[in-house]
Amino acid sequence: MADSELQLVEQRIRSFPDFPTPGVVFRDISPVLKDPASFRAAIGLLARHLKATHGGRIDYIAGLDSRGFLFGPSLAQELGLGCVLIRKRGKLPGPTLWASYSLEYGKAELEIQKDALEPGQRVVVVDDLLATGGTMNAACELLGRLQAEVLECVSLVELTSLKGREKLAPVPFFSLLQYE
């Protein structure tokens, strides 16, 4: 069953060469979201991985702005957990913590509400895609500053040639699909 589900998800990923710049192949997850069966398969595969790896040890899923918001709450619901949001800076009310990270051309910032988690709570970070690892690494930094334990980071797609997984170490990382 898992192989056919993974194939269903993989068949929905579209590739757009030279977008947004020459030499880049953009991996478009929009068709996965459009097709209920492939979206359900993606959530199911991620949930089964997390159950097998962590059992009942996970307290929360942390979804990253913005496409992690599409997968995070659905994954949390599938696992019977709550979901906390890690947003681009300036989007959350109340007291927040923030962290900067590097992009290909400049910097960006993420934030989380200071009361989003209690010290010692165990979290899995989810996003749609791992490229350089900057966003997930900043999220892990923020969660660490809240004294949460990051059990793992997961994504639908991983761009292996950008070595983002290495930036996350020692936090384990899992992806459903890998592309160069």
Curated annotation (Swiss-Prot):
Modification N-acetylalanine, positions: A2
GO cellular component: cytoplasm; cytosol; extracellular exosome; extracellular region; nucleoplasm; secretory granule lumen
Subcellular location: Cytoplasm
Phosphotyrosine found at: Y60
Modified residues (N6-acetyllysine): K114
Post-translational modification Phosphoserine, affected residues: S4, S15, S30, S66
GO molecular function: adenine binding; adenine phosphoribosyltransferase activity; AMP binding
Lineage: superkingdom: Eukaryota
Keywords for this protein: Acetylation, Cytoplasm, Disease variant, Glycosyltransferase, Phosphoprotein, Purine salvage, Transferase
Family matches, as InterPro entries: Ade_phspho_trans, PRibTrfase_dom, PRTase-like, UPRTase/APRTase
Residue positions where Phosphothreonine is found in the record: T135
Pathway as given in its UniProt record: Purine metabolism; AMP biosynthesis via salvage pathway; AMP from adenine: step 1/1
Main location: cytoplasm
Any Pfam family: Pribosyltran
Effect of L110P: In APRTD; Newfoundland type
Annotated Gene3D superfamilies: 3.40.50.2020
Top EC class for this record: transferase
Function of the protein: Catalyzes a salvage reaction resulting in the formation of AMP, that is energically less costly than de novo synthesis.
NCBIfam families, alphabetized: apt, PRK02304.1-3, PRK02304.1-5
Record-stated family: Belongs to the purine/pyrimidine phosphoribosyltransferase family.
Record's subunit section: Homodimer.
Name of the featured protein: Adenine phosphoribosyltransferase
Organism: Homo sapiens
